[in-house]
Amino acid sequence: MKLPIIFLTLLIFVSSCTSTLINGSSDEERTYSFSPTTSPFDPRSLNQELKIGRIGYCFDCARACMRRGKYIRTCSFERKLCRCSISDIK
């Protein structure tokens, strides 16, 4: 009778320790720290952020107008409106 009780007690103790260790290791993996020395400035990540916002949208609008040889006339990020001028670039 003593052997099953000791075995179950030991099993509960081991299972609680392993769950604690697993939770501790997964918390370490989820921790993110930003330090300029360990992760230097990346201009490509900044470029991705700008493409999402207003500056990026109007920049793409201006590039599209320049490819057509026109000036940018209107850029509205809220309405997603990009208009080029009628006259060509001289």
Swiss-Prot record:
Localization of this protein: Secreted
Signal peptide: 1-19
Keywords: Disulfide bond, Glycoprotein, Secreted, Signal
Assembly and binders: Interacts with MDIS1, MIK1, MIK2 and TDR/PXY, but not with MDIS2. Binds to PRK6 LRRs.
Claim: Magnesium is one of the keywords in the record: no
CC annotations in GO: extracellular region
Function (record text): Pollen tube attractants guiding pollen tubes to the ovular micropyle. Attracts specifically pollen tubes from A.thaliana, but not those from A.lyrata. Triggers endocytosis of MDIS1 in the pollen tube tip.
Disulfide bonds: 58-75, 61-82, 65-84
Start and end residues of each stretch annotated as PRK6 binding: 67-87
Name assigned to this protein: Protein LURE 1.2
Family recorded in the similarity comment: Belongs to the DEFL family.
Effect of residue 83 to A: Compromised interaction with PRK6. Reduced pollen tube attraction
UniProt-listed GO biological process terms: pollen tube guidance
Glycosylation sites (chain numbering): 23
Tissue distribution: Expressed in the pistil. Detected exclusively in the synergid cells.
Organism this protein belongs to: Arabidopsis thaliana
InterPro entries: DEFL_AtLURE1-like
Record lineage: Eukaryota, Viridiplantae, Streptophyta, Embryophyta, Tracheophyta
